[in-house]
């Protein structure tokens, strides 16, 4: 049984680290091939993805004595500690130096290639070049680190750990649920889709938060509804204070969110993981969560669909209520940003709107005019979509007014009933 079994998911990364770990554990096997031990590996990625856990598993699997360095001392003392630690590791023989949160050794807000902490790390690695010292590091942002430190011969492998997605996210949710007392109605697939691209730490927090809801209500099991409430809190900071009164504001919010749902579902069926029109205090009266495979858009069609989805709430409100939607500020801003990227950076409508360096007033005006023109076209497409699917829109609106929150399955049942 491998020590890496403690880590849920990340099978590709674990396989690579197990292979490297074998070189560290059994150098003689590789010496016969003329292969030398890699000098070091860096794991980097967003906070909470499990970098430190993966590093600890590597150390345990290797069986080597380890020396840990992290920024828990004043700058001057840290430099001395770095030098002393590498010297101790070299004297030990076969050892691992673990640099935890390496990007925090100096000012992590900017790139400081000449920071004395990084110079000390580089010098330490170089002094151990002909020894059996292996260097393992974690970092949130590798781009804060100097290129000279990241080069081969110092860190031969720089591996990104991303937030779990798809099957990996499902495995993580199921793992955390297995440690709690829950009912069998919890759909781990749905929760994983809702929490797509969030860290393992976020997933753990959601499951724990759901347990708090259950405990406070005096129940002995976590339900799917508890999980949805916890997701709402984590993703959108949705407050608990809601009004039970179906007033004009609640109606506008329900229609607005229903517009997002209709557009998203017609453009890509099954893409809405949940929608809520809880009448929350503040500008955000509701939320519609749309599942995407990637955090970036890979085609013009994905840009088009994104913009239409964003404008569909405004389109639905103004179609059904007959008034200007005053709660669509964030939607409009995000839609404009996507349209500006299409027009400018991606030259989707020609190269004459591309900005390279300082743009002239004439170019800016031309670009703004084209963006506005395209945005009007997108808005008309959004209005057409919600108008031609009024029955779907009305049924989602009615369901939101009654239940406030709808899951993917409930949205599917509404659509199938039409």
Q: What does each model-identified segment do?
A:
Residues 46, 249-254, 261-418:
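Soluble catalytic regions of large protease machineries
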Residues 103, 258-260:
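Short active-site segment of divalent metal-dependent hydrolases/proteases
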Residues 107, 182-197, 209, 225-226, ...:
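Short conserved motifs of the RecA-like P-loop NTPase core
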Residues 2-192:
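Walker A/P-loop NTP-binding motif of AAA+ ATPase domains
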Residues 25-33, 131-132, 239-245, 266-275, ...:
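Active-site phosphate-binding and catalytic loops of NTP-dependent enzymes
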Residues 193-225, 232-240, 261-273, 343-349, ...:
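AAA+ ATPase "lid" subdomain C-terminal helix
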Residues 17, 42, 59, 155, ...:
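Residue-level signature of catalytic and energy-coupling elements of molecular machines
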